[in-house]
């Protein structure tokens, strides 16, 4: 019998969807019916994982744990219970065991913030990327379309043999204004590449993390 919980809140759903665009993944344990979400980051992002756990706590039964991976990499992770709503998302986001982008993707500011905290990077003052190299070009173009629908213009940028999404300079003010309320304290360094500006951001940031509730 599947160990499922009740319906997802809109906030929980947004965090899960943002995670699926980034580093999160869904899986169905053999012999079970419903999917679960696994959140797995480096130990250096412990505060961020703890925040995700706090926001998804009603879906979980175990606290985040440290885990040593290949090459001595230290990860920090947790998983949710199995959930029928996660199974619906699994069917949208996975084909033949590979993560894909559904044509119906619609973004909001929380999803965008989670996506950026998971897989975003900023180099210099106007080079902001979503590192979507895991997805096909066709799937990345779906993301570009979804971003445009919320007023964020972007394009594909070649990264060696792969491609990733680059936020256009003209859209950076809106992009950062949209995600800023939801970026947790420990991840605010991604909001500014300049070390002095980064320090100021950290000093001015709220002591409490955004609860989204």
Describe these PLM feature segments:
Residues 1-213:
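Internal intein/HINT superfamily modules and their associated LAGLIDADG
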């Amino acid at each position: 019998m599947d160990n499922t919980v009740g319906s997802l809140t809109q906030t929980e759903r947004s965090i899960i969807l943002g995670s699926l665009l980034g580093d999160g993944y869904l899986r169905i344990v053999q012999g079970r019916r419903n999917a679960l979400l696994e959140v797995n980051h480096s130990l250096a992002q412990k505060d961020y994982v703890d925040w995700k756990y706090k926001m998804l706590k009603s879906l979980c039964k175990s606290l985040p744990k440290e885990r040593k991976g290949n090459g001595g990499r230290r990860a920090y992770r947790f998983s949710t219970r199995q959930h029928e709503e996660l199974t619906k998302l699994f069917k949208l986001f996975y084909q033949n065991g590979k993560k894909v982008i559904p044509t119906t993707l619609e973004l909001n500011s929380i999803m965008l913030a989670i996506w950026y905290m998971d897989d975003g990077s900023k180099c210099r003052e106007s080079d902001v990327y979503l590192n979507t190299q895991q997805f096909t070009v066709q799937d990345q173009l779906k993301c570009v379309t979804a971003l445009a629908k919320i007023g964020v213009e972007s394009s594909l940028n070649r990264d060696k043999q792969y491609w990733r999404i680059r936020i256009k300079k003209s859209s950076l003010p809106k992009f950062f204004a949209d995600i800023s309320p939801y970026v947790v304290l420990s991840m605010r360094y991604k909001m500014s590449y300049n070390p002095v500006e980064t320090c100021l951001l950290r000093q001015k940031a709220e002591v409490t993390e955004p609860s989204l509730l």
